[in-house]
Amino acid sequence: MSTFTVINPTTAAPVKDIALAGIEETDAIISKAARAFESWRNVTPGDRAKLLRKFASIVDDHNEELAKLEVLNSGHTIGNARWEAGNVRDVLNYYSAAPERLFGRQIPVPNGIDVTFKEPLGVIGVIVPWNFPMPIAGWGFAPALAAGNTVVLKPAEVTPLTAIRLAELALEAGIPDGVFNVIPGKGSVVGERFVTNPLVRKIVFTGSTQVGKEIMRGCSNQVKRLTLELGGKSANIIFSDADIEKAAAGAPGAVFDNAGQDCCARSRLLVQKSIYEKFMGYFERAVKNFKVEDPANESAEMGPLITAAHLARVNEYVPDDAKVAFRGNKPTGPGYWFAPTVLEVNDVNDRTYREEIFGPVVSVITFEDEADAIRIANDSEFGLSGSIWSRDIGRSVRVSRAIEAGNLSVNSNSSVRYWTPFGGYKQSGLGRELGPDALDAFTETKNVFFDTNS
């Protein structure tokens, strides 16, 4: 069995070595999960709900431990990491109400009774990215477990620590052995085996659009169920009638949060031409005051990028001759630091405007009117999130209906609430996570007719 050295992105120092599973180990754990499914699906709804609530409670008890582990492994700010651990707790609590509410229906038919049942799929393979290791894991495993499935989860190779700890806490909560399994390993080994092993009945994948397409092709061989949350290049649209100062103050966090390593990052900033200079003045002040520092500091608003390789990739998007409007600050010394960077763009075909950089870089472009803003915003292969800033309620409704994105926010930059649906249009994904409808993605509907004339 090979190993991988986890690196602290804040210091570039090694943290610990993690054993990586091979194909044989992966198959063995998948088989274990398949065996556990037969008993887990038959745990009474009330008892399954109690176990999930207990799991949530134990995660809450370990919030600070999990948060500090994420700061160490991922470079997330301590404030964000606490929220992320809390989100796992909240998602578990939310879906703990589901086992007792997996309602079927009684459908009127002649000469009999027709009923439907919501039945679990079996083993669910959850493949988690490195940008939000804890919450995205929870978005997959919580509804899957609530619906009576078992889970095999592959954390990203570079950020496995919190997932491993969550699996330990699940056992502590009384979740039976084999029901929730974490398998550290390479995507080309463990992730690929999730796709090809017929015992895995569904894949939940969050990551790049390119890899998502490969997984989609692989799943087609077995008509394997699939949920995808992929790339984004979200638009932050500022109209002239907006609260300009408020919009500018919120814009840095909308794109630089988590060092821009967020599929929902508003990395395209569309500003109405008549207010461009005024907005940019407020925006520059906000960017220069954005606190990029040791993520363990309570005051930190942004930490480092995840790896040296990713830092090099982001650097490629901002060459020496790039049209930089202004930058924020960054620490000196070790670690994978990149200063918040604002680029002025005049061409929608500019590479920085079209491609997902996945770093603290935002491209600013102007628009003339409402129709122009909609056209520019929709000129993207992605459609995950976005913001609309306007005091005109009619305009806000019109634009929000016209923008091709799955998660929009008016006069704010929010994207995710665990009790509302989350997912993308176009090449940003397939299906929805979170909210009341996500559970349907982890069940099959069975229809049964009873002939009462027999």
Locate the predicted segments by residue.
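Structural signal for hydrophobic packing residues in well-ordered secondary-structure cores
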Residues: 37, 41, 56-63, 67, ...
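N-terminal Rossmann-like NAD(P)+-binding subdomain of aldehyde/semialdehyde dehydrogenases
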Residues: 1-112
